A protein has these predicted regions:
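Short, low-complexity Ser/Thr-rich regulatory SLiMs
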Residues: 48, 61-63
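Coil-to-beta-strand transition motifs
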Residues: 50-54, 66
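Acidic, Mg2+-coordinating catalytic module of metal-dependent nucleases/exonucleases
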Residues: 175-193
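Anionic group-transfer/hydrolysis microenvironments
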Residues: 47-49, 104, 184
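ATPase catalytic-site recognition across NTP-hydrolyzing enzymes
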Residues: 1-49
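Mg2+-dependent endonuclease catalytic cores in nucleic-acid-processing enzymes, primarily RNase H-like
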Residues: 58, 65-175, 194-195, 199, ...
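Short beta-strand scaffold segments in enzyme catalytic cores
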Residues: 55-60, 185
Length: 206
């Protein structure tokens, strides 16, 4: 009844107790061909890190017609300064694309823009924006190119928090294994109507 059965049970049927442990339970891992993404919209997202957490630049395509998110490339590294991030974006040929980066790092965004990545923009964040973004992504088919090993590792380990009293998973993800996946969520803001999610949810819930 839905591309993501867990999503359908929770948001359409209201069966929140059946929430799967994984935030993204339905992910395909394979080689993505150029033909598949023909005509799809390119997106690029950036999550900042430094010493303990890596900076994660992730990109891919979104096919509105096929309701499919393709994650096709990643660059993940710790200890990167902003000028190094900008240089890598330029080397990868992504500097002319719209890049959506974590809005908590306005200074970093400004420094990367000054280094020649002129279309970098801050992400939009509002109340429950993380969960709303996750919900929208889970309405799509998710395909990760098998060469994106960091993103795959995160998808296999990114889980919902568990209520210690009830033992049930709650509607808030653990803050771990989420650097690449946060970058995906940011990047998709440039091509997808994620802001419309509240309306979609109300329609599903009747």
């Amino acid at each position: 009844q839905h591309r993501n059965p867990a999503y359908y049970r929770i948001y359409a049927l209201g069966e929140f107790a059946t929430l799967d442990r994984l935030v993204y339970p339905c992910v395909e891992r394979r080689i993505v061909s150029a033909d598949e993404v023909q005509g799809a919209k390119l997106w690029v997202g950036l999550d900042f890190g430094y010493v303990n957490d890596p900076s994660a630049l992730v990109w891919g395509y979104w096919s509105e017609a096929a309701h499919t998110i393709y994650i096709t490339g990643e660059y993940v590294k710790t200890g990167m300064l902003n000028d190094e991030i900008a240089a890598r974006i330029i080397e990868l040929g992504l500097s002319k694309e719209v890049i959506i980066a974590d809005c908590a790092e306005q200074k970093s965004i400004a420094e990367i823009k000054r280094a020649g990545v002129y279309r970098i923009r801050p992400s939009r964040k509002g109340p429950d924006s993380v969960v709303h973004g996750i919900q929208w992504i889970n309405q799509q088919r998710i395909v990760i190119d098998e060469r994106c090993t960091h993103t795959i590792e995160e998808a296999e380990n990114y889980v919902w928090k568990k209520d210690r009293k009830t033992g049930e998973y709650i509607n808030e993800p653990e803050d771990a294994y989420n650097h690449c996946l946060d970058a995906v969520r940011y990047g998709l803001q440039s091509v997808a109507g994620m802001d419309k999610l509240r309306t979609i949810n109300k329609a599903l819930l009747g």
